[in-house]
UniProtKB/Swiss-Prot annotation:
Enzyme class: transferase
Principal subcellular localisation of the protein: cytoplasm
Residues annotated to bind UDP-alpha-D-glucose: S1043, R1044, D1046, I1358, H1360, H1373, G1377, T1378, D1397, Q1398
Name of the molecule in the record: Sterol 3-beta-glucosyltransferase
Compositionally biased spans, kind Basic and acidic residues: 670-689
Organism annotation: Cryptococcus neoformans var. neoformans serotype D (strain JEC21 / ATCC MYA-565) (Filobasidiella neoformans)
UniProt record, GO biological process: carbohydrate metabolic process; lipid glycosylation; sterol biosynthetic process; sterol metabolic process
Keywords noted in UniProt: Cytoplasm, Glycosyltransferase, Lipid biosynthesis, Lipid metabolism, Membrane, Repeat, Steroid biosynthesis, Steroid metabolism, Sterol biosynthesis, Sterol metabolism, Transferase
A single MF term (Gene Ontology): UDP-glycosyltransferase activity
Disordered, as annotated region: 1-154, 177-225, 249-279, 625-645, 666-852, 1499-1555
Length: 1585
């Protein structure tokens, strides 16, 4: 509410000159209140000070003289009194708002009308006039309070320090349309005068400086800067950009003014009239120009125009500067580079935050410190979003965006995009990903051979758009075969776990391990096919509200609720298309918003119809136009709206999996040639008729074509005449496509288009020429859903032959040839498939050393791309014959292209080299080239060094070929390094960002370089591998024992799981409690002393005979304590992750009936690729030995603990005794927390075994609430000093190892450091744990009686993550965590293994050539290893490459994804609890093969099992009668307990109450989970294995 208007304000004596207040017969007296208020403001402007109190009688003559002088020299701004200049400078400096408090004696002057009647007559809303809320610079003034109360120029509300020249304020007031203004908005309520922030719908213009010519008789008004806040303001709008009406008004003659005034007085209430501010009274002679003549009133128009243009340019510059300064503060994203300001629309412009300083050389912008107004921020964003929505979707007019929501569009693929709700449309926008070097999926699959029909297991990799298979995961450059998904027809699941990939030439059959794995592969391949065949395209879906039939919720997905929008098909009124949207931020809110929008949609006459080329005959039989691409020539208003997308052809894709192409009777695809603009109007006006005839002819000729799928029925007879009439006079507003499904077949369309990559994949091309197709007046078209798929723009330097054919001048034989080539691309026969790539290489590279001396032929390029499955963008530069050495030389030909170095063997029948007949190496992976002597006489050798791979040896018959090959490869290596990423601006990325740059949500999470599914587009729709899906928060327990290195990875994993919302707990040894809880993780203690365990392992070796004998004596009680404490620690868990070394997890999970995972730091699953980590030989012994080590270890390990474990199962867990085979440990999901770069996954591992990458824990020693870790004093100086002396710094430490002779080890280390000439950082760590009490311990000066030289800096412990990147090499014991840390830092690693898995990591480091292994620690061997690690450039470079690859991994993220993916599988293998009733039927074997035989009772099976067990024990265990149930033996393993009671059903009395007592027969039957992997093993097979 505005303040009350004082009816009788105190009289004021305004200091106006006599000329300004002279009255005559033609100048009636204005109302005194109005005059006094206005004159106070104008007087303040004349003196360039804030309004002050009225002048006294002594000051009045001086004021009159000044006013007279300035009136005479009104056109000369430089004539100002010196005191005025001083005042101006003082005011320009500014007065803080907090100093501008009015005193008590300040007088208040208010505007008021002369009478209530006149006030009501002229009570107009003043939109925008209340902004900006400027503060007066002079305190204690009546004028200041008058302005605050009347004009709402309040002093400091929502703004900071504001400088404002009063003259500019008056200029802004003069710019207001006091008379009729056609550009003004309609009046609104007076409430907006009080709250301008809510009424922010006024149009905003940028500033234009007004000409400095007098418009009133008040004399000269000096121009100065008016600093407004960065917000919408009507005053600034008129001052910045005066319209023609305003200029005519201000510079009009008295006669014109009188005429306008009288007209305004007679039509004061007319619609569209801009009212006066509240309190002002319209008067005919209020602002009549002075009588200085018409010359003064009419300045030179050219001068005015030039001044306005100049001020417009200055305002543009200042506005952009202010926008850039305040964009970050106000959180505005303007997208400047995407929407160039070609035309300045009033709705897109903001008021200048600062106006130009008139006559001043300084044109800086003063930043305004103010709080962000959220309402204005949303309004500004919505305005920009509406503009961009009109640009991107090509809407005919700007529509206000009511809602903006992220969601998914569900079809055969799931597209993530944005939904926009307007009053007339539902719009959806998605951008197809365009990423290179993207690993989509990899894993083992069986491939069926084409001739032998045998299945061979390969490691299959889906990368980019190529599906390749390899014999080994460690040989990524020699694929056995590949498939380019760009030319694939389909990928479908067949019977069992098989699926087929179909191409034009042959079919490929693959077999997965499980059906879920098969489905994931099919989904991944299908989505890559779609992405590849529509790379870089944008998907736009426009649903008019009048086409919507119903909106309802639909449980389409098993893990989320979808919203189904049903739309009527404009082509066929009997069919309804459904569009499914899911994964809204709030599904209920989105559903209610869409429903509300549909309910409140305007009536049909109010909605503009969305025209479509296929809806002109909506009531007739639908014609197939799915292959039609309609293009127009000339200009169009709609094309201007579309902007950069207006010249692109649109394609509507109906199906991805069924690329069927229509053919004519002669087998050639139909194509109508484009009509150029030289055709007459009669021909052009019948183009839609031509389209209809073409479609009808296709429909008739397809009677014998098997591509027809039977629905809808074929059209019979010619189209009705009404359709032709409609086609002649109708012109679409912009190019649209029919309403059929984008990715799935629609009931209204019987044919599907080929999902090719080219932008002109169409069998019918219709060109709209000029303005021949006119819009029909008075007739509306039925709205249809528009689906547009826009191909990427090809730049001028990459104009394709298809684009050339669409030019107007091409209507000759060349066009026919181009059409034939384009049709060949669409055909899927073997001949035309090959022809689809027959595009001449446009290589501009030099043909160095080329035998032919010219560029390669199109046929050679085609074969090259086809054989190596490369894209059409890959250009062949040259090729050479030569030999590739693996074991023996393999003859073939080497190919060099823009990005690849390839080899193809010519010895196709040479079976021993079959695996090496194909080589594809990316040039970016080449590290170097080196010429060398050949192995054979008369040849020239070449060594190719590859990053992260072994060297490759090549031979040529002549030195000239080798020289040419080296020159080309070096040229391409340099070009690839310099080019980096493509810098060409992708228009579709721009358009995608146009819709996404205004998104206010959180930033996108960084993608994992080794993702299970790199983006949601490639995620499976199943709930276990869909990345957007997260299970409900769970209580997850991690169970592990061992050293610090065994516990640390679980801390990292638990922190990642906590970030996902889960509750985590670690159960391990009690000495780690403070460390674990310091990271905010719950802790449970389990039994066992890790120091004693390590001492025994070091003394006896891992699982040797002496180790087992000592274990029989010492660790029987240790194992019982471990088992019981593990059971107690895991209570209340929803999911269990265990290290296999804990030995109890699988039994605890079975008793708790919870999903169970295993995780370990070394290989534990049987494979032929690597030996067991506890049985690594000094030299490799091959696959059979490796597999045998796992079998032997599993059997021995189980025999050693089975007696105690089975007794614990019966007495504590209430479970039956088990065997090694019954546990089925090979079916348990496994997470290996080491890098696939270091240990590539073997082919014989199943899909639920994941090599995730290292689980690094940065700053492991830090605790919550404590300050960050700092290095020991002097360590940084030691490292810097060594590097300054050009010495290498190495780390030597054996952290968690108990050394039997620490004195000898210390002396050996010191001698090796001195002899190698390096500086060392020595950490003994836990080496003192095994020492006896009372022995002296080491310090920084020495230890074990050995004095440290200056080259050694001794520490107790160190953060490896901090230290390793600062040094040159590391020597340690080879623990999994320490090895991962040194490899991650990219430094050579020396390992001295002591026990356990350390020998395995030493072997891997040596195999990768990133370090050395020392089997026996001597000073000589250690010194040699240190010298090699610090001087061998090959080893240093290889370690650097491996470090880069490891740093790109995200092991924790991949581990969590694997947990989600296999969660359902882990639940499916949970074993059922035993029955409490002998009459309970035997458990079913599988949900696929249930046992239905009624005569198989549990008693009969149990008796057979018991008899067989006893007979087995009679043969193999003669001591069965002398061994007690509680006895423990490695050989017998408690045989009597297993034979006597292992298979017997435990009575309810012997079970814990919380497990067995509540279980009845019915509960047991209903609680059974199906076993997906075949039948359960029959109990009669016996208990012992």
């Amino acid at each position: 509410m505005s303040p009350p208007i004082s009816p009788t304000p105190p009289p004021l004596q305004p200091p106006f000159p006599p000329t300004a207040i002279a009255r005559g017969p033609d100048r009636p007296d204005p109302p005194p209140q109005h005059q006094q208020a206005a004159e106070s403001l104008v007087n303040a402007a004349a003196q360039h000070v804030a309004p002050t109190c009225p002048p006294t009688s002594d000051e009045l003559p001086q004021m009159e003289d000044q006013a007279t002088n300035s009136s005479n020299d009104s056109l000369i701004p430089s004539r100002q009194a010196p005191d005025q200049e001083e005042t101006e400078n003082a005011i320009t400096a500014g007065t803080p708002p907090d100093e501008m408090e009015p005193t008590k004696d300040a007088q208040t002057v208010r505007f008021s009308s002369s009478s209530p009647a006149s006030y009501s007559t002229h009570e107009y809303p003043t939109e925008g006039i209340n902004e900006p809320r400027t503060s007066s610079r002079a305190p204690n003034t009546a004028s200041s309070q008058m302005a605050e109360s009347s004009c709402d120029f309040r002093s400091s509300r929502d703004i900071g320090s504001i400088r404002m020249g009063a003259s500019a304020l008056v200029s802004a007031l003069n710019a207001l349309p006091w008379e009729e203004d056609d550009d003004s908005d309609d009046g609104e309520d007076d409430d907006e005068f009080i709250e301008p922030a809510r009424g922010s719908s006024s149009t905003i213009y940028e500033r234009k400086q007004r000409p400095q010519t007098p418009s009133t008789s008040h004399g000269f008004h000096p121009t100065h800067t008016l600093h407004f806040p960065f917000r919408q303001n009507a005053i600034a709008r008129r001052a910045c950009q005066p319209g023609t009406t305003e200029l005519d008004y201000q510079y009009a003659t008295p006669e014109t003014s009188s005429r306008r005034t009288s007209a305004a007085g007679s039509e004061s209430s007319s619609e569209g009239e801009v009212p006066l501010p509240k309190g002002f009274v319209s008067h005919p002679n209020l602002i009549v120009p002075s009588g200085e003549g018409e010359a003064a009133a009419h300045p030179d128009p050219k001068l005015i125009s030039d001044r306005i243009t100049k001020e417009q340019q200055i305002a543009d510059v200042e506005e952009q500067a202010e926008i850039l300064r305040s964009a970050e503060e106000q959180e505005m994203r303007l997208g400047k580079e995407f929407v160039p300001p070609k035309s300045r629309d009033s709705a897109d412009l903001n008021v200048d935050a600062a106006l130009r300083e008139g006559g001043s050389e300084r044109e800086d912008v003063i930043e305004e410190q103010m709080q962000t107004n959220e309402a204005e921020k949303r309004l500004t964003r919505n305005e920009k979003l509406a503009e961009r929505l009109m640009e991107v979707f090509g809407l005919e007019e700007r529509e206000e965006v009511l809602e903006e929501m992220k969601c998914w569009l569900l079809r055969s693929v799931m597209l993530k995009g944005y939904m926009y709700l307007t009053k007339r449309h539902i719009c959806f926008f998605a951008n197809m990903p365009n990423e290179n070097n993207l690993l989509v999926k990899s894993g083992p699959l069986h491939k069926k051979a084409s001739r032998s029909k045998l299945n061979t297991k390969f490691w299959v990799v889906l990368k980019n758009d190529v599906l390749s298979w390899y014999e080994s995961t460690s040989d990524p450059y020699f694929p056995k075969g590949n498939i380019s998904l760009q030319y694939c027809h389909s990928c479908d699941a067949v019977s069992g776990t098989r699926f087929k990939v179909r191409t034009s030439e042959r079919n490929y059959t693959f077999t997965a391990d499980t059906e879920s794995s098969r489905d994931e592969w099919v989904k991944a391949i299908q989505k890559v096919m779609f992405k590849t065949q529509h790379e870089g395209e944008t998907i736009k879906l426009i649903i008019p509200l009048e086409a919507i039939v119903d909106v309802e919720k639909s449980p389409t997905l098993e893990f989320t609720e979808t919203i189904e929008v049903k739309c009527i098909d404009a082509e066929d009124q009997m069919s309804v298309d459904s569009y499914f949207f899911a994964s809204f931020p709030d599904n209920d809110y989105a559903f209610s918003a869409i429903q509300k929008l549909v309910r409140e949609r305007p009536s049909p006459p109010e909605l503009p119809r969305i025209s479509s080329v296929t809806t002109i005959h909506a009531n007739q039989e639908p014609l197939d136009t799915s292959h039609a691409t309609i293009k127009r020539h000339g200009t169009d208003s709609s094309a201007e709206k579309l902007g950069m997308a207006s010249h692109r052809p649109f394609r509507k894709i109906s199906s991805v999996l069924k690329p069927l192409i229509l053919k004519s009777s002669d087998g050639e695809p139909l194509e109508e040639h484009s009509q150029g603009p030289h055709h007459n109007d009669e021909d052009a006006s019948h183009l839609p008729h031509i389209e209809a005839i073409s479609n009808r002819r296709r429909s008739e000729e397809e009677s014998d074509n098997d591509y027809f799928d039977g629905y809808p029925p074929r059209q019979v007879g010619p189209p009705p005449p009404s359709m032709n009439d409609d086609a002649r006079n109708w012109r679409p507003s912009w190019i649209r496509k029919p309403a059929s499904k984008l990715f799935g077949s629609s009931p209204s369309g019987s044919f599907v288009s080929h999902p090719g990559r080219l932008p002109t994949d169409s069998s019918t091309t219709v060109t709209e020429s000029g303005p021949s197709l006119r819009s029909r007046t008075g007739r509306t078209k039925q709205a249809s859903v528009t689906e547009v798929m826009e191909p990427p723009i090809q730049y001028e330097e990459e104009v394709s032959e298809d684009e050339m054919s669409n030019k107007p001048s091409v209507v000759d034989s060349n066009s026919a040839e181009t059409a034939r080539k384009r049709a060949a691309r669409l055909s899927w026969t073997s001949e035309t498939s090959s022809g689809s790539q027959m595009v001449k290489s446009k290589s501009d590279f030099s043909m160095l050393g080329s035998e032919s001396g010219h560029s390669e032929s199109a046929e050679t390029v085609r074969k090259f791309r086809t054989f190596f499955a490369l894209s059409d963008k890959e250009e062949l530069i040259d090729h050479f014959p030569g030999y590739l050495y693996r074991v023996l030389p393999v003859s073939g030909r080497f190919f060099i292209s823009t990005n690849y170095f390839c080899f193809r063997s010519s010895q196709l029948l040479y079976k021993t080299k079959e695996s090496f007949r194909l080589m594809i190496i990316p040039i970016r992976d080449l590290y170097g080239l080196k010429a060398q002597k050949a192995f054979r006489f008369g040849h020239s050798g070449l060594t190719v060094v590859i990053k992260g791979h072994e060297e490759i040896f090549i031979e040529f018959r002549s030195a000239s070929r080798r020289k040419a090959c080296i020159a080309l490869l070096e040229e391409r290596m340099e070009a690839v390094r310099l080019s980096g990423e493509n810098t060409i601006v992708d228009s579709h990325k721009i358009e995608a960002r146009i819709m996404e740059d205004l998104d206010e949500s959180t930033p996108v999470e960084p993608k994992s370089p080794w993702p299970v599914s790199p983006s949601p587009l490639f995620g499976s729709t199943t709930s276990t591998s869909f990345l957007e899906f997260k299970p409900e928060p769970m209580k997850i327990t991690c169970l592990t024992i061992g050293s610090r290195g065994d516990v640390q990875p679980y801390i990292a994993l638990c922190k990642g799981l906590q970030a996902e919302g889960h509750i985590t707990k670690i159960a391990t040894h009690g000495e780690y409690k403070a460390w674990v809880e310091g990271h905010g993780i719950a802790f449970e203690s389990v039994g066992g002393d890790p120091a004693e365990l390590m001492q025994m392992c070091v003394d006896n070796g891992m699982f040797t005979v002496s180790f087992l004998k000592e274990g029989l004596q010492k660790f029987r009680g240790w194992l019982d304590d471990l088992l019981n404490s593990s059971w107690e620690a895991c209570q209340g868990s929803d999911l269990l992750i265990e290290s296999p070394s804990a030995m109890s997890g699988i039994h605890v999970a079975e008793a708790l009936r919870i999903p169970y995972y295993r995780a370990f730091t070394m290989p534990w699953t049987r494979t032929r690729a690597y030996p067991h980590a506890f049985a690594v030989p000094e030299h490799g012994r091959g696959g059979p030995y490796n597999y045998m080590t796992y079998t032997m270890f599993d059997q021995v390990f189980w025999r050693a603990i089975s007696g105690q474990v089975n007794r614990w199962r019966r007495n504590v867990l209430g479970l039956d005794a088990t065997t090694f085979d019954k546990m089925e440990q090979h079916k348990v999901p496994f997470l290996y927390n080491f890098s696939p770069t270091v240990v590539p996954p073997p082919l014989d591992w199943t899909e639920w075994i994941h090599v995730t990458g290292y689980w690094f824990l940065d700053k492991a020693d830090e605790k919550q609430g404590e300050k960050s870790w700092t290095p020991p004093q002097g360590l940084v100086d030691f490292i810097d000093k060594a590097h300054g002396e050009e010495k290498k710094v190495v780390y030597i430490g054996f952290g968690s190892i108990v050394v039997s002779d620490p004195e000898e080890m210390t002396r050996c280390v010191v001698e090796a450091v001195v002899n190698s000439g390096v500086c060392a950082i020595l950490s003994k760590g836990w080496s003192d744990r095994g020492s006896k009490k009372g022995e002296p311990k080491g310090d920084s000066e020495g230890a074990d009686g050995v004095k440290y030289p200056p080259e050694i800096f001794a520490i107790d412990s160190i953060d490896h993550g901090w230290l390793f990147p600062r040094i040159d090499a590391a020597c340690h014991h080879g623990g999994a965590g320490t090895t991962g840390a040194s490899l991650r830092a990219g430094i050579p690693t020396i390992i001295k293994p002591f026990f356990g898995d350390q020998a395995f990591w030493a072997e891997r480091v040596e195999s990768l050539n990133v370090g050395s292994s020392i089997r026996r620690l001597t000073s000589h061997q250690l010194a040699s290893a240190l010298i090699k690690a610090t001087t061998d450039e090959k080893q240093i470079s290889k370690a650097r490459v491996v470090g880069e690859m490891i740093r790109k991994e995200n092991g924790i993220t991949r581990a969590i994804e694997a947990i989600y993916r296999d969660l359902e599988y882990a639940k499916s293998i949970i074993k059922s609890l035993p029955s409490t009733d002998d009459r309970t039927p035997e458990r079913i074997s599988s949900h696929l093969h249930p046992l239905t035989t009624a005569d198989l009772s549990f008693n009969r099976v149990r008796s057979r099992s018991r008899s067989r067990s006893r007979s087995s024990q009679g043969r193999f265990s003669p001591r069965r009668h002398t061994v007690d149930d509680d006895g423990w033996s490695v050989v017998s393993g408690g045989s009597r307990s297993r034979s006597g009671s292992a298979s017997a059903v435990t009575s309810p009395e012997r079970r814990p109450l919380n497990i067995g007592s509540a279980l009845g027969s019915h509960v047991f039957k209903t609680a059974l989970l199906p076993n997906t992997f075949g039948k359960w093993r029959n109990l009669e097979e016996g208990d012992d294995r």
